[in-house]
Amino acid sequence: MFEKKNLWIPFILCFALSIIGCKSKSGMAKKGSIEQIVPIKIDTIIQKVIVHDTVPKLSLGEHKVWTLGKAGIHANIRQETAIHYDVRKPNYVIIHHTAQNSLDQTIRTFQVEHTKVSSHYVISRNGVIVQMLNDYVRGWHAGLSKWGTITDMNSISIGIELDNNGKEAFPDAQIEALMVVLDTLKANYGIPAANFIGHADIAPARKNDPSVFFPWKLADRGFGIWYNPAELVTAPETFNPIDALRIIGYDTRNLKAAIIAFKRKFVVNDVSPELTIYDKSILYNLYQNY
C-alpha cells in the first residue's frame, strides 16, 4: 500500500508544477498587458490634467466670440436658457405668436429636447421680456422658410415670440415691450427697417403668425414696411404683381400662399388668395419703395 502511494507522488508533483507554470505564464501575460496599457492611461490622465489645469490665452477668434457673447446678453431682463442653437450674426428680426396658453408653457417648450425649436425672446401679455438665447446665437425658430434669395433664415435672424394664442389682440403692454426690444436690436446691430418681418412672410404655406391682430403699422416707428394710404393709386396695366411680391421678398412658388400672407399683413379684412384692384394698389405702393 505504501509503495502504491509513492508511485503517485511523481504524478502529483508534475501536476502541481504544471499548475504553477500556468499561473506564472498567466501572471506574465497580465504583467505584459499592464505594461502596455498603463502608459496609455497615464498619458490620457496627463492630457486631461493639462487641459483642466492650464488656462491658455484666447486667440483673436475666441476673444471675439467671448466679447460678442457678453454683448449679446441684456442683464436688466429676465434670463432663461433654450437648448437648441448655433452661432451667427443677426440681420433680420422674425416676429411670431406662440399659439400657446402661457409664457411658462412657451419657455418649457424651448427647454425640452424633443421639440427642436427655440427663440431668442419671449414677451408675455403683460410685457415681461424673457431672453432665452444670446443675440449672436442661431436659434431654431424660422424652420423651412425663404425670403428673397435667403433660404436659411435662422442663420441671420433673431426670433421673438409673443405670448398669444393667435385669436386675440396683442395687449398694449406687450407691444410696448416689443418696441423696446426692437429698438435695442435695431440700434445694436444696424438692422434695416425692412428686415423686421413676420413668420408668415417667410413661410407663407406653413405659418400664419403673427396673426391679423398684430399691428404691423408699427412701421411708423421704424420696424417693417407699410404703404402710404395717401399715395395709393391704381396699379398700371404693365404692373406685374407676382414680380412685385417676389421683389419684396415673398416666395411665390406657392402663389396663393404668398398672396394670403401678403393680404393677412397689409389688407387684414380680406385674406382670399386673389388680388383685388385695391390689393394691387397697396402692393404697387410698396413695390415702388424697393
Over which residues does each language-model region extend?
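C-terminal motif of bacterial Sec signal peptides marking the signal peptidase cleavage site
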Residues: I19-G21
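Active-site-adjacent loop/helix surface patches within enzyme catalytic domains
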Residues: K31-I191
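Bacterial N-terminal signal peptides that target proteins for export
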Residues: F2-I9
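Hydrophobic helical h-region of N-terminal Sec-dependent signal peptides
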Residues: F11-L17
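Basic/polar, cationic surfaces and motifs that engage anionic cell-wall
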Residues: S24-Q36, P171-Y290
